[in-house]
A protein has these predicted regions:
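Structural motif
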Residues: 9, 73-74, 181
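Conserved N-terminal Rossmann-fold NAD(P)-binding element of oxidoreductases
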Residues: 10-15
Length: 271
């Protein structure tokens, strides 16, 4: 049983964030009561309100908070939100409080999770995978780190068998996930305020890669520093999957795609 199932209400402190809002949309789509706080009204918070999610913009204990029951309410927060009266209230009244990364991890425990990690390219790659899942008619949910041009949202709900998630390396959040398949687009030095140096961030990606079950698959950009079996991809360089002969004509990109000694011509309008 998913431990999240016992909660009927989900309160998001910092609901206007791109990662918090897709979780809020997920629980709302699942029929839960969802409400939250954010400091500033934005286009995204207006969209959430239009979808039926209650949001306040004052750090105060309104009636909708005072009426919540700690036995069936989960409070979700992001470390970006600090020193809130609302969070202090929830702490003092014995509410269960979890970081956003932990909650996403609990969701992935009960789905077949496709996770996209890397210091660059997570949102684009995740959106492409979500598009393919959608076209294939798979029962999936996707949690994106940006607003997808084709979905007009950072979230899409088509079912719960599969999940497509961005595996965020910041604060080692991706180690909370339970990925079945994963792509690592890069392991360049980033977030050195958290990791300290390039070697430590690479170890973080190694720890993430080690979460993939041996009977599932990990795909990595060729040249990524990992010590485990994986399949590689590249552009203009031989790999397990690679493309070459790239050209752009009349707004379309043309290229040859290579795998297992076979070459297939491709074209698409994505830049």
């Amino acid at each position: 049983m998913n431990v999240l199932d016992k909660y009927q209400t989900f309160y998001f402190a910092g609901i206007g964030g791109i990662g918090m809002s897709n979780l809020a949309r997920y629980f709302h789509a699942s029929g839960k009561n969802v409400l939250g706080y954010d400091k500033t009204e934005t286009k995204l918070t207006k969209e959430l309100v239009a979808e039926g999610i209650s949001i306040t913009f004052e750090d105060d204990i309104h009636k909708n908070i005072a009426d919540l029951n700690p036995d069936n309410t989960l409070v979700v927060y992001t470390p970006a939100i600090k020193n809130l009266k609302i969070l202090n209230y929830f702490n003092e009244n014995n509410f269960q409080i979890l970081k956003r990364a932990k909650v996403l991890g609990l969701i992935t425990e009960h789905t077949e999770c496709i996770a996209v990690a890397g210091t660059h390219g997570k949102t684009t790659t995740s959106t492409l995978i979500a598009h393919l899942c959608n076209v294939a008619g798979l029962p999936f949910s996707c949690f994106l780190g940006g607003i997808s041009e084709n979905f007009k949202s950072n979230f899409l709900y088509k079912g719960n068998q599969y999940s497509v998630v961005e595996a965020d390396e910041y604060d080692r959040s991706f180690l909370q996930l339970s990925p079945d398949w994963a792509i690592i687009t890069s392991d360049d030095a980033d977030h050195l305020d958290i990791y300290g140096d390039a070697e430590t961030i690479r170890q973080g990606f190694q720890d993430f890669a080690n979460l993939i079950p041996e009977n599932r698959q990990l795909f990595v950009r060729k040249g990524t520093h990992l010590n485990r079996p994986c399949m590689t991809y590249a552009v203009n360089s031989p790999a397990d999957f690679y493309s070459d002969e790239l050209r752009i004509e009349n707004g379309k990109m043309y290229f040859s795609f290579h795998h297992e000694g076979k070459s297939t011509p491709f074209s698409w309008e994505i830049p």
